[in-house]
A protein has these predicted regions:
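Non-heme di-metal
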Residues: 1-132
Length: 132
């Protein structure tokens, strides 16, 4: 349980870092952020009802997909933007560690259809946020 509390604190750090960096770059957050947060919380709560192994499997798969998403951003960021790169690399490292911790603590690999639904949902979220 300790690792989940620590991971939650790191996720909060990530949100703060991203908000700060967006402000520095005169960027803006997606208007959908509250919806994404509420949806993610709800989905996490649903998976939590299936027991610890499934819940940890959900954490593992979520973090794996976040790592892939961060890698895509890292490939697009100008090498001159060292501050953003550093933030994303730190986030990537944290997310990868969260996935590994979920496995080490008994996470059960999710079934392929569940992984595909998660991937599709993430794609809808990221593409919608990018355009609105």
């Amino acid at each position: 349980k300790e690792h989940l509390i620590e991971a939650g604190e790191e996720e909060t750090d990530h949100l703060v870092w991203c908000k700060k960096r967006l402000d520095e770059l005169d960027g803006k957050e997606s208007i959908f952020n509250p919806l994404w947060y509420a949806g993610s919380f709800t989905i996490g709560a649903i998976f939590g009802r299936y027991g610890e192994k499934v819940s940890l499997g959900f954490v593992e798969e979520t973090e794996k997909q976040v790592v892939i998403h961060l890698d895509k951003h890292l490939n697009k960021i100008s090498l001159k933007d060292k501050e953003t790169i550093e933030i994303l690399q730190t986030m990537r490292s944290d997310e990868d560690a969260h996935a590994q911790q979920a496995v080490e603590n008994g996470g059960e690999e999710l079934e392929i259809p569940t992984k595909k639904i998660m991937k599709y949902t993430a794609k809808v979220m990221t593409s919608t946020s990018a355009h609105i």
